[in-house]
A protein has these predicted regions:
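Alpha/beta enzyme core
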Residues: 2-83, 87-228, 232-240
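C-terminal segments
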Residues: 239-250
């Protein structure tokens, strides 16, 4: 079993390749084990998928529940894991930094902090201060913990691409290791973002269906995630199987 430090170095090298590696999103221990066995080199948690596995909605998970979930996934897998850490479970920059330190203790090697509070977008200055605090906390850790900064404006329909790019550039300057703007819906937008920043970029692929990994790699995208889509596929399949069982009486 690789150590946390070894996993962190592996995770860092995956991003440095800028070769659009897929990082699927498990929602529980079983799905994490399945995805590792399938051959993926790293995993990313999904806040929505985890919440729904507990019968709740996205954003209804406590910090302690999130940390326990991350500890579980780390304990049943041997590959790097990064975490959808939502808003860092705090509004205050200092508290976000403290929570990043707690997150690292679960065995994961990265995490994301977004500029959405679950009710409103943080203003530009506050959003940057939060990323800076998270980056400072990450830098103090004994491993190369990779901090992803998320600009949520497209996903929440509160900002245009120019606003997103301004935030991503500021997050990069504040110390983020990876940049992420969920909601980019075409390759032109992805290319525009890549042309404005220098840090590795994550793309959420369900917004760009039918586009190959190779096409993203040619642009220089570092990482591809699927969010809660895999969890959604499993839930849909379960519903269809259940309906068939009730309708036909045959399994």
């Amino acid at each position: 079993m690789p150590t946390q430090s070894e996993k962190a170095e592996i995770f860092k090298s995956l991003h440095e390749a800028r070769d659009a590696f897929f990082i699927p999103n498990p929602w529980d221990g079983g799905s994490a084990v399945t995805l590792e066995k399938a051959g993926f080199k790293a995993l990313a948690t999904t806040s929505a998928g985890f919440a729904r596995s507990l019968g709740r909605e996205d954003g209804e998970i406590s910090l302690d529940e999130k940390l326990a979930h991350c500890q579980l996934l780390s304990s049943v897998t041997s590959i790097p894991i990064t975490v959808d850490f939502e808003n860092g479970f705090a509004d205050d920059p200092g508290e976000v930094g403290a929570n990043i330190a707690r997150l690292s203790e679960t065995g994961v090697v990265g995490g994301s902090v977004e500029d959405w509070s679950r009710t409103v977008m943080y203003d530009f200055t506050h959003a940057v201060e939060r990323v800076a605090a998270a980056a400072e906390a990450s830098a103090r850790l004994p491993i190369p913990f990779m901090l992803t900064a998320r600009a949520e404006g497209l996903l929440r329909k509160t900002g245009d691409l120019d606003d997103i790019i301004n935030r991503l550039k500021a997050f990069e300057a504040a110390g983020a290791d990876v940049l992420y703007a969920p909601g980019l819906a075409n390759l032109e937008g992805v290319a525009t973002v890549l042309g404005e920043v220098s840090k590795p970029v994550n793309v959420l692929t369900p917004f760009l269906p039918g586009i190959s990994r190779e096409a993203f790699a040619e642009l220089g995208v570092a990482r591809l995630s699927v969010g809660a889509a895999l969890a959604g596929h499993v839930t849909k399949a379960l519903g269809e199987a259940a309906e068939n069982l009730l309708t036909t009486g045959i399994f």
